[in-house]
Amino acid sequence: MQNRPKSVLTPARLGTSGVVRNTLEDPWVRFQIELEFVQSLGNPDYLTFLAQQGCFDKPEFINYLSYLQYWKSPSYSRFITYPFCLHMLDLLQSPDFRREVAHESVTRFIDDQMLLHWKNYLRKRAEMVNKHVQSLDAMATPGPGPSS
């Protein structure tokens, strides 16, 4: 039998005293859990589920969403794979948005907007980069010098 390294995703790990400790006390596990949760906020269907379950009516949950704002800082946001989740985290700070996201029509609208963004992003970005390069080329091209 091989000795495999213990995974960081095990439900519980041993503390320095050999006693099993709560996984939320482990900073690495907590980091992973919070990262996964923040990224799940980019899923409009999940937001609708949370709203329909009444999570957005609980002050503790609202405070947790506020606490998670630290993920917007560059030292943490560099770990984010789906940056749209940070925009959704911002929107979730609004009571109006939390109330409206419970409706399927709002979820479909958000889904549609995300798909349109993904569909057109690369083309629009390429156009913007080309315009920028052209403007840099125009600035770098020296004009006629003084006449002698």
From Swiss-Prot:
Q: Which UniProt keywords apply?
A: Activator, Nucleus, Transcription, Transcription regulation
Localization in the cell: Nucleus
Provide the family line. Belongs to the Mediator complex subunit 31 family.
Coarse class of the protein's main subcellular location: nucleus
Report the superkingdom from the record.
Eukaryota
Name used for this protein in its record: Mediator of RNA polymerase II transcription subunit 31
InterPro entries found in the cross-reference section: Med31_sf, Mediator_Med31
One Gene Ontology cellular component: mediator complex
The record lists the lineage as: Eukaryota, Metazoa, Spiralia, Lophotrochozoa, Platyhelminthes
How is the subunit organization of this protein annotated in UniProt? Answer: Component of the Mediator complex.
Q: Which GO biological process categories is it annotated with?
A: regulation of DNA-templated transcription
Sum up the protein's function in the record's words: Component of the Mediator complex, a coactivator involved in the regulated transcription of nearly all RNA polymerase II-dependent genes. Mediator functions as a bridge to convey information from gene-specific regulatory proteins to the basal RNA polymerase II transcription machinery. Mediator is recruited to promoters by direct interactions with regulatory proteins and serves as a scaffold for the assembly of a functional preinitiation complex with RNA polymerase II and the general transcription factors.
Kindly give the Pfam families that the UniProt entry links to this protein: Med31
Q: Which GO terms describe its molecular function?
A: transcription coregulator activity
